[in-house]
Amino acid sequence: MSTTAAAPTGIPAVPGPVNPPPPEVSNPSKPGRKTNQLQYMQNVVVKTLWKHQFAWPFYQPVDAIKLNLPDYHKIIKNPMDMGTIKKRLENNYYWSASECMQDFNTMFTNCYIYNKPTDDIVLMAQALEKIFLQKVAQMPQEEVELLPPAPKGKGRKPAAGAQNAGSQQVAAVSSVSPATPFQNIPPTVSQTPVIAATPVPTITANVTSVPVPPPAAPPPPATPIVPVVPPTPPVVKKKGVKRKADTTTPTTSAITASRSESPPPLSEPKQAKVVARRESGGRPIKPPKKDLEDGEVPQHAGKKGKLSEHLRHCDSILREMLSKKHAAYAWPFYKPVDAEALELHDYHDIIKHPMDLSTVKRKMDSREYPDAQGFAADIRLMFSNCYKYNPPDHEVVAMARKLQDVFEMRFAKMPDEPMEAPALPAPTAPIVSKGAESSRSSEESSSDSGSSDSEEERATRLAELQEQLKAVHEQLAALSQAPVNKPKKKKEKKEKEKKKKDKDKDKEKEKHKAKSEEEKKAKAAPAAKQAQQKKAPTKKANSTTTASRQLKKGGKQASASYDSEEEEEGLPMSYDEKRQLSLDINRLPGEKLGRVVHIIQSREPSLRDSNPDEIEIDFETLKPTTLRELERYVKSCLQKKQRKPLSTSGKKQAAKSKEELAQEKKKELEKRLQDVSGQLNSKKPTKKEKSGSAPSGGPSRLSSSSSSESASSSSSGSSSDSSDSE
């Protein structure tokens, strides 16, 4: 469909070819009706597409004469445009939403058939079609008639009213239009809702119960003000409708790419489940809320008591996840997975405990979460289900990871409270607590199920939960830093304890030596200080003490950095350290760079929306915490390579001083108690110890070697404090 400019109506009688009449927009003989799906098409799909910058060529039928396209109507036998579709919806022309979707498909297909694939108009049509498919994916699954088809002739009149009514339906969709009041509805219309109100049959199990006004109350004056039809859709949406795409559905045109190929919405609306549902519904005449989360879950849950500070924080996290800000990748998680509609026949065999954001919100509103950990467990269960069911390269998995990053970042900033240890804002807390929480959620859900299920079901559920745990741990292993820092930290701890004992034995001698050496070094230039620090591994015991005292004297940052990992996190990097970090990042293999980008984007709001493939890193603009996290990750990746140079250099030093040691071995063994490190016969441990306990290159080495995901940071920090104070 090439660019269109003017409607073909009113073409002057010019000799030569003329445009055929435009497609009909009303037909009294053709039965039509108003359904919740058609209302959605009118108020969400058409409205969204109409506002798009690429929509203008499709506003009106193609004017082949004006555009000089003599062969257009020979090639395109069924012209279609958005203006026609819009008018048909306004006139209740369609019987079901599938007819309307067919018109959209015809419009796009005509464009693709007539134009070349490289034409701009084709690219514009593709962009519109992608949005069209995304919106259709969110359409109500069950088609429910809003007005009976009987008063068809008169029923055209309130088309404008019905159009306004549609805005009530859109409460759970991103492009929401406020409901406009009904004006000047003729008295004939006032009886329509009454007719609609009579067939109030049973409501399917998954629909919330609706207060039904009695049929015997048809006061015409009140009805125009209270059009019973408009409020029906929110009731349908709130509980009974399953969103087409949940954790198994991507945003692209492959709506059901996860495990089913054909998009169900085209066939679903035709099913005759709908009969006459509750046409009048329970009518809360309130304009629809503008934000996504308010329309997603029924708001009937009354306040059952104040939320704790942590749960208030969790509630704000949930609201953010449901906000429009994250809608682009959060929408598959808004509603429970409708396995039947999506033809995912094995979904409930694989996923035993489905979870989604609307369920979490319902539980939050009804105060079902005793603490923040229960909330976090449900959120992580939702992501775990997604990772488990879908292949790792699936688009919905990428969306889940994005949304989980949002959650973990916010959850890590939980206000401190003694009871909530995993929620402390240490940088590694999300990762540590993540595994703990998923296991806790598994235990909770398995214990809940134990009371109601049989032994066999319990066993199968336990096996399934273990699989879930395994999937989460696999993901953790890929995302988290390698835990090779832990042994090093333990070793440092032992060495520090040993150091403390040595100090207790020969405290006076050590202090005397330390003072004398400190005075000598204080006179030396900064360059000499650096040289001494580099040679520190070959020096004797008290050089370690001297170095640590120098750091204390020169600036309190070094000693303060022992206090806690959090303080280490914020230590600024020197120019040399940044340069070294840059070199180390360049040494990383390609597959490790993704994590580097992830660390930067998760900690730097200004870079969060940048393209990961083309990100430019300016170390001068990065926060110290980001740089420290990068340093830890890079060191954990390069640790194996680093160990070899460390050991070889240690051997060289041992070889150099071997003869000396042989001659003075007895002397040095006698002085061993006076040494701070107590490692004269082995230079390697001394070097390792110094890199951790007395950082020769500045505070950064301390933070990189002593920071770990284990919970022993406080104990090692306190032991180093005591060693420094002495």
Curated annotation (Swiss-Prot):
Phosphoserine sites (modified residues): S262, S280, S564
Q: Cross-link (Glycyl lysine isopeptide (Lys-Gly) (interchain with G-Cter in SUMO2)) at which positions?
A: K413
Alphabetic keyword roster: Bromodomain, Chromatin regulator, Chromosome, Coiled coil, Isopeptide bond, Nucleus, Phosphoprotein, Repeat, Transcription, Transcription regulation, Ubl conjugation
Which subcellular locations apply to this protein? Nucleus; Chromosome
Note the Pfam families from the entry: BET (PF17035), Bromodomain (PF00439)
Give the span(s) annotated as Acetylated histone H3 binding.
Answer: 77-79
Please report the name of this protein according to its UniProt entry: Bromodomain-containing protein 3
Q: Which gene encodes it?
A: Brd3
